[in-house]
A protein has these predicted regions:
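ATP-binding N-lobe of GHMP and related small-molecule kinases
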Residues: 1-102, 116-126, 138, 158
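Active-site nucleophile and cofactor-binding loops and adjacent substrate-binding regions
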Residues: 105-106
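Short beta-strand
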Residues: 279-282
């Protein structure tokens, strides 16, 4: 019997970062994180399970993916099959509505959409918490893309306890806008996965990061609760810069920031001096971008 399902999920930007995994296999982070989900950038996915299929196929933006991506999706679908208790292979058709030049990682929305589509196709009846766990197995940040608005990813200590949940802001996110500034389109010399591991294992600054990130998280959540934009902005700026500082303490040291990154940060500071309420947070995707959050 052919089974199919469709879903849409939106990408998110971490305001309080996670940097480093405690468990690489189950994607368990070293610390909790806080994100905001974006309304303009999303992934739409259709998944079809068919007894006649002999392998999993992923069609991304109209093109079949390469062998490396195919292996990754097959591994993920094995997790889905184990959960569902069947061995059907699937055809996955996915469209990313994320501008390539913006440098936004689409894995968050991609795996959140895939998890939700599989849930529908296989009638798994998963709760949002269960969906968050399942999405996390594909991409850690995907755990947060199950939810709109603000979401916190609880690090937990195993597969069962590591999941995201929504943070109630009484709709405050609708009063906020995020601007993405593309710094450059050069590929990273150090991947995020490699950078996380190197920093976790060798940086003398890493423990300092862990010591302060919970404090940052609590302050950010309190700011969201009180709709205190200035406090939220101050916390997320400091948190992002501390994350990048840990990389400079790694052996060997590395950084994702370039001169243009600092130039863009300076522009944000100049805007604040001109009474335009805005703050920056930095990301480290394939194309370095500088998201700027503004109160409107």
């Amino acid at each position: 019997m052919v089974k199919s399902g469709k879903a849409r999920a939106h990408t998110n930007i971490a305001l309080i970062k996670y940097w480093g995994k405690a468990d690489e296999t189950y994607i368990i982070p070293m610390n909790n994180s806080l994100s905001i989900t974006l309304d303009r950038f999303y992934t739409e996915t259709k998944v079809t399970f068919d007894p006649d299929f002999t392998e999993d196929r992923l069609i991304l933006n109209g093109n079949e993916v390469n062998a490396k991506e195919k292996e990754k999706i097959q591994n993920y679908m094995n997790i889905v099959r184990d959960l569902a208790g069947n061995r059907l292979h699937a055809r996955i058709e996915s469209e990313n509505h994320v501008p390539t030049a913006a440098g936004l990682a689409s894995s968050a929305s991609a795996y959140a959409a895939l998890a939700a589509a599989c849930n529908e196709a296989l009638s798994l009846n998963l709760s949002d918490t269960d969906l968050s766990r399942l999405a996390r197995r594909g991409s850690g940040s995907a755990s947060r893309s199950i939810f709109g608005g603000f979401a916190e990813w609880e690090k937990g200590h195993d597969d069962l306890t590591s999941y995201a949940h929504e943070i109630n802001s009484n709709g405050w996110e609708k009063d906020l806008s995020m601007i993405f500034v593309v710094i450059n389109n050069q590929s990273k010399k150090v991947s995020s996965r490699s950078g996380m591991s190197l920093t976790r294992d060798t940086s003398r600054f890493y423990q300092y990061w862990l010591d302060y990130v919970d404090e940052d998280l609590n302050e950010a959540k309190e700011a969201v609760k009180n709709q205190d934009f200035q406090r939220l902005g101050e916390v997320i700026e400091a948190n992002g810069l501390r994350m990048h500082a840990t990389n400079l303490g790694a052996q060997p040291p590395f950084t994702y920031l370039v001169q243009e990154s600092y130039d863009a940060m300076a522009i944000v500071e100049q805007c604040r001096k001109a009474n335009l309420p805005c703050y920056f947070t930095t990301v480290s995707y394939t194309h370095l971008t500088l998201p700027t959050i503004c109160s409107v």
